[in-house]
Amino acid sequence: MPRTRNIGALCTLPEDTTHSGRPRRGVQRSYISRMAEPAPANMNDPLLLPLRMNTPGLSLVQILLGYMSWLTYLACFLRTQTQQVFLNTCRCKLFCQKVMEKMGLLVLCVFGFWMFSMHLPSKVEVWQDDSINGPLQSLRMYQEKVRHHTGEIQDLRGSMNQLIAKLQKMEAISDEQKMAQKIMKMIQGDYIEKPDFALKSIGASIDFEHTSATYNHDKARSYWNWIRLWNYAQPPDVILEPNVTPGNCWAFASDRGQVTIRLAQKVYLSNITLQHIPKTISLSGSPDTAPKDIVIYGLESLPREEVFLGAFQFQPENVIQMFQLQNLPPRSFAAVKVKISSNWGNPRFTCMYRVRVHGSVTPPKDSHLEPLS
């Protein structure tokens, strides 16, 4: 086939009278002819690219423009060859022509992207000047400071947690101290806010004629060369003093006894308080020497008449117990007798630590008695 032959003549197909009743339009043939005109004269010669790829000194934009020009010529060549091959045997020339155009554009885009990606540098190098180095150095220093301050904050947080733990321990110790002070107040009886008319320091005393004998045990005596020197047993008036410590008590034999207390002055009686040490500080560890069943009598000076005021039971679990008198006659008394009927299990002796008597020197408000002269 001669090289100068028109491509339009080669691609002309006989008219298909079976599918359409009219011949193909000449516009399509002329359009195909125009598309084939830019083809080179000699198709077998190698293609000569308009740009040199490895020319030194060219920028990236110039290289890309050269690649695009080369790809454009390559796409035109491929499209022309494809049209010559397929359009001579294809009846749907217009459809095939559009398909070839789309395929050519797609191939062009894919090939261009591939070439662009192949010639991109594997690592982008950033040229830094003095205007960039300064802020970057400042940023690094700021990061180091932030990291350092973060460590300091964590250390401060740990120290704060330790301080909180110490404060909690101090609060616990303070609570324990408050509890100990409360216990001491309970032992000393400071929480009972009533006047004690049986207190020795204000004039109260013991009527020894109407009081049981003191219990004398061999261990409460001291001997030197088998000669008795001193009896360490406490007298009955120890129950009128506020010093309540282990051993500082009045003991009488067996589980029955009594003590008569002369009050500092005549009193309209209302309450009586008994106190004993807790078993936790007792040397024996048992409250068996504490009194149990108690009867209270009021005594007048002349004549000495006993008036029943009440009967109670002392519980050793509560070291201080205040009892409300059951019988409150409308008169005053100069003395009080405390009668012990039993203790909490010790058959040899019973201990009494402190007895307090409460009331008022004036008649109660609900009575219509005359004040004492």
Curated annotation (Swiss-Prot):
One of its GO terms (cellular component) is nuclear inner membrane. Residues 136-180 form a coiled coil. Residues 1-103 are nuclear. Highly glycosylated in the Golgi apparatus during spermiogenesis. Residues 121-373 are perinuclear space. Changing M160K: Increases interaction with DNAJB13. Impairs nuclear inner membrane location, expressed in the cytosol with some protein aggregation near the nuclear envelope. InterPro entries: SUN1-5, SUN_dom. Probable homotrimer. Interacts with DNAJB13. Plays an essential role in anchoring sperm head to the tail. Is responsible for the attachment of the coupling apparatus to the sperm nuclear envelope. This is SUN domain-containing protein 5. It comes from Mus musculus.
